[in-house]
A protein has these predicted regions:
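Multi-pass membrane glycosyltransferase architecture that uses lipid-linked
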Residues: 1-219, 257-380
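Juxtamembrane membrane-water interface segments that cap and precede transmembrane helices
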Residues: 63-75, 236-255
Length: 380
């Protein structure tokens, strides 16, 4: 048990050193902390008095941190960084347990060291709140592999209430635990999130509906579909003050989709279903490779992409793929996303989006192919 806490302790120590040594503005950097603070500064509570583009857990957490900080931005930023540091430390702990389950001692250490290096050096982990959703995802994954469907369902349900992406582990649960337990995991996960959204809808139907509508209404960004639609922009919404008006959630200045999203969903959904039915998985590592395929297909279909979403890929890449492949593909896709944001787009160089999107999409395809080879009997 104690050995699993060594890497988390190193991460916490290194993060605290950064927090003590750097100006707070340097830590906040090119992330979304200003956006989070301004949203929390709005009067009232998310989903009740204003709409939010995020699922409810983080907006409520942000509001709580704002109130604990007495509205002081520096205190808000510091507390949020500490919360994200705890989440990253727990992610390392869970990754360590997963690695020990899959590999011999020395290889598990190498892969854990790679993940520690990513979390310690990649600013996305403290610029955005995705580390909290990754925590729910890894916890759900561990409990799926341990065949604990109820616990896995609760973890994934909480993850869905942070970011939608952990729902993608439900097919993995069915593959690992069979239809009865896997469907139970899915029912609990979706039921928990539906229960929370239902309660919010009863409290404020207008702003809950606006919150749910906001992401689907904003159009495409930073993907091949966005290039096709002529949307050379990021996924940001308008000024925070607009969230006090539920009608603004459905407004967008982006071009509509040239190819309707439901059409591309049929194509990629069909690929996903064929993969689910055809691939035979036997080992836990192959199960994680199957999950990597699922994530890859989903994000190849997705109308939008944000560079920090690479955080959802790093654990399965390091757990599923051969170590040389994991290092090469993982390192390259990290660099490609950093080049996109913050290096180029923060400087207004949106004309480079066709290049960065093309590189990332190619890497995503290679990732899916590598994961498919891992499941279907490729190199371990």
């Amino acid at each position: 048990m104690k050995k699993h806490w060594i890497a988390p302790a190193i991460l916490v120590f290194s993060r605290l050193l950064l927090l003590l040594a750097l100006p707070l503005e340097g830590m906040v950097g090119y992330g979304d902390f200003i956006h989070f603070f301004r949203i929390a500064n709005l009067a009232g509570w998310p989903y009740i008095h204003y709409w939010s583009e995020f699922p409810p857990i983080f907006p409520f957490l942000g509001e709580l941190i704002y109130r604990l900080s007495a509205g002081r931005e520096t205190t808000f930023d510091t507390l949020l960084i500490l919360v994200l540091t705890v989440a990253d430390a727990l992610n390392l702990y869970l990754f360590s347990r997963l690695a020990d389950r899959l590999f011999q001692k020395e290889e598990a250490r190498v892969r854990l060291g790679g993940y520690l290096l990513c979390l310690a050096g990649l600013a996305y982990t403290w610029w955005y709140f995705d580390s909290i959703a990754v925590l729910a995802m890894l916890l759900g994954l561990l409990w799926i592999l341990e065949q604990q469907p109820v616990r896995a369902g609760v973890a994934l349900g909480l993850g869905i209430l942070i970011k939608w992406f952990p729902v993608l582990l439900i097919p993995l649960a069915i593959k690992k635990t069979g239809w009865r337990k896997g469907v139970l995991t899915g029912i609990i996960a979706i039921g928990l999130s539906a229960l929370v959204y239902g309660g919010l809808a009863l409290a404020s139907p207008k702003f809950t509906a606006a919150s749910l509508q906001s992401q689907s209404a904003k159009g495409s960004w930073e993907t091949p579909w966005a290039l096709l639609d002529g949307n050379l922009t990021t996924g940001n919404f308008g000024p925070e003050i607009e969230r006090l008006d539920a009608r603004t959630a459905s407004r967008t200045d982006r071009n509509p989709a040239v190819i309707p999203t439901w059409v591309t969903l049929l194509v990629f959904g069909g690929l996903g279903l064929a993969t689910f039915l055809r691939l035979k998985v036997q080992t836990d590592r192959q199960i994680i490779s199957f999950g990597l395929i699922t994530f890859g297909l989903f994000f190849l279909w997705s109308p939008g992409w944000s560079p920090q979403w690479i955080l959802y890929f790093l654990p399965p890449i390091l757990l599923a793929l051969p170590i040389q492949t994991a290092a090469l593909l993982g390192g390259t896709i990290i660099l490609a996303n950093l080049m996109e944001w913050p290096v180029l787009l923060s400087r207004g160089m949106f004309w480079t989006l066709p290049m960065t999107i093309g590189i990332r999409t190619l890497l995503m395809i290679l990732l899916v192919v590598a994961a498919f080879q891992s499941v279907s009997g490729g190199r371990e």
